[in-house]
Amino acid sequence: MKTIFALLLGVALVTVSLAQKEKKPWTEWSEKEAQKILNDSPWSQVQKDVDTTEMFFQPTADPRTAGARAPNSNERLQQGATNQATNLNYGVRFFSARPVRQAFMRMIQLQQKKLEPEVIERMKNFAEMPASDAIIITVTVEGTDKRSLGAVMQVVESAATGTLKNTSYLERNDGKRLFLQEYVPPGRDGFGARFIFPRMVEEQPFLGPEVTDVRFVADFGKTLKLNRRFKLADMMLDGKLEY
């Protein structure tokens, strides 16, 4: 009997501990907790792409004088090569979801200690404001090689709604797709490129209780294709779907 009581007490304590942890205000998050929301959470994922084409290139060998010419060798000779695999990480996030905005604001607070009270208040309003009429996906790009990163950023920064509206969409598990409404290239705020979709379709939310998961796809052509799937059952906040 004592053993059963001890087990029940242990479960109760764990439940209370988890509840307290879940209620921790975003303004008290640590950097690690904010990064977790931004990179590995129900609302955020990181797509990792590895390019191994540079691993076997010899920068000291000029294909123009060595006989056989490898594909794109002129360009690679002029630009140089890393002789190693390059990594590109794409942060794909539901920016319209409050936890993501809160994590971004918390990171700014941690990095900039001396913020004016009115600035802090504006940040709080921005972080806690419910999403209204749009689903916003943001994408950031980070890389280990400046040349590879620069090439991708050029594509991302020069893209426009017209070139992406037929190749970027949200797809529900039932196959229904919602195509891009507006694309906004990345700016100086650090939030990344914005993919904006209407929240309502035929006077109904595109994502509702009957939907189990949603996939975000953005095809920039041969240079970049993003494809991430999110489970709606995990995207709950205070008992409601948050996106």
Predicted regions and their residues:
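Bacterial N-terminal signal peptides
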Residues: A6-T15
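PEST-like low-complexity, intrinsically disordered acidic/proline/serine-rich tracts
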Residues: Q20-Y243
